[in-house]
């Protein structure tokens, strides 16, 4: 299996999710030094091996990188982080400028004696792209850690920073207690086996408690809902209609993963083009109304999940139905 965290992609691309600003970070902790966390250590080994394999010339200061990463992992989750943008700017300038120039110069040196030589990564293992510029090494190491930390933080993985850092540091020093293959196996087991089972059990227990709440009803499919505002009962959508809504989506721990309110813009979509829980649930409320939906995973994103929504995760949505556009007709208006 290809690396679970492909570090070049972690560096240059943001995690695809719609996390909303100012939310507490409850998944990353410093951890217990006396009790090893194998998942965190495996992620560290995976990250360290990815950096070294993909960019052997990038001789980072691992301590500075790790400290910058840890600082970000322990901060709250925000939609737009200015520190991330500052780090991105520094990294893009370095990778598109000095790094390319120095790599090209090294390649020219290696090929001077044989222009037909095919260069491979091993040719750059002993090459230091910073060329002794310690100020630049410090700046890029910290920027790399900052940018990577913000992205990993958005994943909300249950990691301990002490063991994550230790995995990176020990792999970089050729002292890791597990190899890349075992690290990937541990990560794969978490995503494919442990996390789906954990989410399924926790979601089932959560929905059972929600069902006991006042005003909550349950459909035959297992969808839980509460009508917060009835709206116009004469103008309810069908599955074939298009609706205009505002909404807020939460995970079972209250984490807001998506919100049209946060973006400041309502959204329109055909009701038969979304998850089953939405298709069924919005037909229960009238135009101008508001409904809260608790959606079991089989009516949501199922065993695959989506972005911040894990496999077998139940969801909560608060939805305001602003308008109903009948299939093949103009928007319905009411006085």
Model-found features: residue ranges?
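Bacterial N-terminal signal peptides that target proteins for export
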Residues: 1-9
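Cross-family detector of peptidyl-prolyl cis-trans isomerase
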Residues: 20-335
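C-terminal motif of bacterial Sec signal peptides marking the signal peptidase cleavage site
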Residues: 15-19
């Amino acid at each position: 299996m290809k690396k679970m965290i492909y570090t070049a992609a972690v560096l240059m691309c943001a995690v695809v999710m719609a996390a909303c600003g100012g939310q507490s970070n409850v998944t990353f902790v410093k951890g217990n030094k006396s009790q090893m966390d194998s998942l965190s250590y495996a992620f560290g080994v995976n990250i360290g091996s990815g950096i070294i394999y993909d960019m052997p010339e990038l001789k980072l200061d691992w301590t500075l990188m790790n400290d910058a990463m840890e600082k970000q992992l322990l901060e709250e989750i925000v939609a737009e982080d200015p520190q991330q943008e500052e780090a991105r700017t520094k990294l893009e300038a370095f990778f598109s400028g000095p790094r390319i120039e120095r790599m090209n110069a090294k390649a020219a040196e290696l090929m001077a004696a044989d222009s037909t030589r095919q260069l491979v990564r091993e040719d750059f293992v002993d090459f230091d792209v910073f060329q002794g510029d310690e100020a630049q090494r410090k700046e890029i190491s910290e920027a790399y850690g900052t940018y990577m930390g913000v992205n990993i933080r958005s994943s909300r993985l249950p990691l301990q920073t002490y063991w994550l850092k230790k995995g990176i540091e020990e792999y970089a020093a050729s002292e890791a207690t597990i190899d890349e293959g075992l690290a990937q196996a541990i990560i794969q087991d978490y995503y494919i086996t442990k996390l789906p089972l954990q989410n399924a059990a926790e979601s089932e227990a959560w929905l059972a408690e929600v069902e006991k709440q006042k005003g909550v009803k349950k459909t035959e499919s297992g969808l839980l809902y509460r009508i917060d505002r009835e709206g116009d009962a004469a103008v309810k959508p069908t599955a074939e209609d298009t609706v205009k809504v505002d909404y807020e989506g939460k995970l079972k721990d209250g984490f807001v993963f998506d919100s049209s309110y946060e973006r400041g813009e309502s959204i329109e979509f055909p009701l038969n083009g979304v998850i089953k829980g939405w298709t069924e649930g919005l037909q229960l409320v009238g135009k101008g109304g508001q409904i809260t939906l608790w959606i079991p995973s089989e009516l949501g994103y199922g065993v695959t999940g989506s972005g911040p929504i894990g496999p077998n995760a139940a969801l909560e949505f608060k939805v305001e139905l602003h308008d109903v556009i009948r299939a093949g007709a103009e928007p319905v208006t009411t006085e």
